[in-house]
Amino acid sequence: MKMRVFVTGATGFIGSAIVPELINAGHQVLGLTRSEAGVKSLMAAGVQVHRGDLSDLESLRKGAVMSDGVIHTAFTHDFSRFQEVCDQDRRVIEALGSVLAGSNRPLLITSGTGIANAAPGRPATEQDAPETCHPIPRVASEQAAASVAAKGVRVGVMRLPQVHNTVKQGLITYAIELARQKGVSAYVGDGRNRWPAAHVLDAARLYRRALEKLETGARYHAVAEEGVPLRDIAEVIGRGLRVPVISVSPEEAQSHFGWLAAFAGRDLPASSALTQERLAWRPTGPGLIADLEQMCYFDADAGVAFAPLARASR
């Protein structure tokens, strides 16, 4: 069935890849934006513009009412006030859900694979629920999804790994800028801890498939690579920036990485076996290391890859 899909974050890194994926599959897109540049970008892509932002809950409710389904990717990436922006995401999901209850219209929200409560050393799976008291406040998004599901909303969760291309790579974007600022590319301990990854076009394709076949309460993992060692990531960044690669102890991690220390030393492998089986999704894009090797580290126009450490909003 062809749908009119309301996409939040439609001009963001992932949203801007989802939009053409939906259009090419025959869906119509209603895209949320707050800026004139966003309006021009969406109109050029053949998208109907819906003005608003994450603080305007009424505009979000109106966008959802006007649509057959919702993909929510927008998030304020300000890690200096991470708890606050995660609480905002909870309110956004609750607002979207409030007008979808009982309608059977799908709502696909976004979370991260690191939220899963997996046993140490074992890749997180779609069956792993989030910890009740998770140390990462982004768990609020999945808690909000569970809350609206209990009220009759057909809601599912897309858990993202480090989503990448040759310009942007999730948290690794910030690690690159940190290495640029400090003159060294670092990892914690022996660097054997792992982060999962997926190319942005593979992730976009999965969002579309998940929305089309969404099951209430389902969790989907957009994982192409189960775990890339942080030492490997640090080494390719070091080569790209032409800076030394060093190990920092767990005790030194906070001083070196700042807010990124909450993630830098964690082993977060994740599997997408159930997602691939359920949605016949097969990732085909380049791997994380390949994209890091191909990016231009010294191009002033490389864009968000060198955004300020504290904030990168979309």
Regions flagged by a language model, labelled:
Residues 151, 161-194:
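NAD(P)-dependent short-chain dehydrogenase/reductase
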Residues 139, 164-174, 181, 209-220, ...:
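Glycine/proline-rich active-site loop of Rossmann-fold NAD(P)-dependent oxidoreductases
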Residues 16, 31-94:
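NAD(P)H-binding glycine-rich loop region in Rossmannoid oxidoreductase-like domains
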Residues 52, 261-314:
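C-terminal amphipathic/interface module of NAD(P)-dependent oxidoreductases
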Residues 3-25:
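N-terminal Rossmann NAD(P)H-binding glycine-rich loop of SDR-like oxidoreductase domains
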Residues 2-4, 206-260, 300-314:
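Mid/C-terminal beta-alpha module of Rossmann-like enzyme folds, strongest
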Residues 28-30, 76, 90-135:
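Conserved Rossmann-fold NAD(P)-dependent oxidoreductase catalytic core, especially the SDR/UDP-sugar
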